[in-house]
Every structure is written in structure tokens, then in C-alpha cells.
Amino acid sequence: MAVQFEVLTGVDGARLAIATLDAPASLNALSLPMIEQLGTHLRAWAQDPAIVCVLLRGNGSKAFCAGGEVRQLVEACRAHPGEVPPLAATFFAAEYRLDYLLHHYSKPLLCWGHGHVLGGGMGLLQGAGVRIVTPSSRLAMPEISIGLYPDVGGSWFLSRLPGRLGLFLGLTGAPINARDALDLGLADRFMKEDQQDQLIDGLLQLNWQEQTTLQLNSLLKALEQEAREHVPAAQWLPRREQIDRVLDVSDPACAWRAIGQLEHQADVVLAKAAGTLLKGCPLTAHLVWQQLQRARYLSLGQVLQMEYAMSLNCCRHPEFSEGVRARLLDKDNAPRWHWPDIAQVPAAVVEAHFSKVWEGRHPLADLA
């Protein structure tokens, strides 16, 4: 199993459930079986009155979760050119249902987001009730580099960031550290890497029969106080004003050019982000622009329904397969995009990514 499940019993007989992503060789990238296992156990734990709290974490020092296992998806896309592969329809439906479940979980759900927290890993972290980051945390939605787009609810949480930071992070795939995550409302608590055992011990010592919220908050607060001096310096809020000015534009092509002009700036953080965009997928930039505009007033369920259509349509078009080939399979880092110029991406192609590609009722129609 690529996810390990265990249940520990606390001092008062209450039980703590722990789910550990256990595929460190792939940085705990989510495969369909892992997603299905998580969904099954989380639903069972929600119904078990003996389970009082859930902790979601990843094995290995490098990553909580570096995204979805897209290699298998691309193999399926290549086997079904121009179509929606059955694996894609199943994978994205299961993943988005899992994300929705996390956001609406009925019990305290903590997620330990150390190391790389990318793509699908962000979907898991953002769904947790207590999102914990560490000195090694690097959170990002880097889909611009592989011809996909920030999914797993990215439309929802990026569109709600201050100013135009969500648009910037979606377009550039730029990583944020723990301080950034706390500042932007993408994390709740900061702890050191070596405090996880203390956290588990503390959870097992709590009296889960009364004043649960107060006790849990006191535990988290105490651990965070111990770690306070290890919080890294902020990167993105100090640059927000400049980013807002740069992205005060009317369309994605202008945004592409405006960010691109930062590539040779002395500010290495902005320059690196600009370089990533300029090597990225122009179609993705259009999708990011559109998804954030459309998601602004949507519920999470509506966002995931929209993203389901987008993801299936990405599987029908060549950019996703080509991006994964260049970045993850052949690793030549030289993608040959079908539309290499952002100004030449047809508006009809962008719009088509939001259209249904299934018969009858939306497969995620029950997500409120």
C-alpha cells in the first residue's frame, strides 16, 4: 500500500487516526489507488465515534506530497488521442471528491505539510482544518510548466488571495515558504520538523470529552511558540504592491508580457518567477486567467465541478502530454507547445476547456 493507516489510543481511550502517504521515491505523488484508499479510510473514520481526530502526513524528509501521479495519466492520454481517457475521468473525479471531503470533514483534521507541497498536495493541505507548515515547506501550484492548470480547488484558493498574488502564483508556479503561507491564509500553524512526535503525543494526551477546541488550540499554540524563531522571512507580501502594479492589465497576453519583463530584474525572486512563466505553457496562462475570474463567486463545489471539465479537456489537448514529456519523462525541459505564442492561442480553444465532455448529469453534481 502506498498509504499507511494506523489508529493510536489516547489516555482517555479516544483514538487518533493517522494516514501517511508512503511513496517517498515519487515524493508521495498521488496515484488513483492512493486517492481511493484515502477516501475510503477518511469516510470510515468520520463515521467511527471512537475516532476523535485525524492526522494526514507524508513519509520521507523531502515532501508531504509533490502532486498527482501524472505520468500514468499521460500514458492514458497518449493511448486515447483527442479523447478523454477512462483513467482521467476516474482519477479526477476521485481526487476532487477527496478534496471536497477534506474541506467538509466532520472531525478535527490536521495536515503536516513539510517539504514540497505541490499541486495535488496543495489540494490535500488546503482541505485540512489545521494546515501545518515547517521550515522546509515549499508550497506551489506549478502546472504552468506541464501544460495543465492549478486544479484541486486552486481556482478557489488562489482567487481569494490578496490583490493579484493568486494570479501571479498561478501564472508563474512560484513557490511560497511557511511565512508566506501563514501570511496569505494558506496555512494555520508553524512547527519545526522535529515536533511531529510532540504533536502526536500531545493529541494522545488531550481529554477529548470536553472543551476539545480549547485544548487543541492550546496544544498547537504551545508547539508553535517553541518554533517561532525558525519561521523564514516573508517573500511575497513585501512584493505584493509591485505585483499588483505589474498585473494591472486587461488580458492574459498582457500579463505574460508584463511578468516577462521582470526576468532580468535585480530581484532574483521575481526574475526566477518570470523565467518560469516564459518557459511555461501559453494555453495554461489563458486557463489560469479564466479560471480565477470565473471562480471568484463560486462555491468550492462549483469550482471543483468547473475544474473537472477543465482537467478532462486538458487530457484531450496536446499541451498536457507534451509538458509532462518535457519536464518529467524525457526531462529535456524543452517542451514543443502546440501554441508557443500566447497571442495565438485561439479563444475558442480556451473556451472549450470549460465545456462538458460527458453525457447527462455532471459526475460531481452532488458536490454542493
Indicate where each model-derived feature is located.
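Glycine- (often His-adjacent) and acidic-residue-rich active-site loop
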Residues: 58-97, 147
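Gly/Pro- and small hydrophobic-enriched strand-loop and loop-to-helix capping segments
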Residues: 129-150, 185-200
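Conserved CoA-thioester-binding segment of acyl-CoA-metabolizing enzymes
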Residues: 1-57, 100, 368
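Glycine-rich beta-to-alpha active-site loop
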Residues: 102-146, 169, 173-174, 178
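Long, low-complexity C-terminal extensions of enzymes
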Residues: 256-272, 277-368
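Hydrophobic/aromatic residues within transmembrane alpha-helices
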Residues: 56, 69, 124-125, 180-181, ...
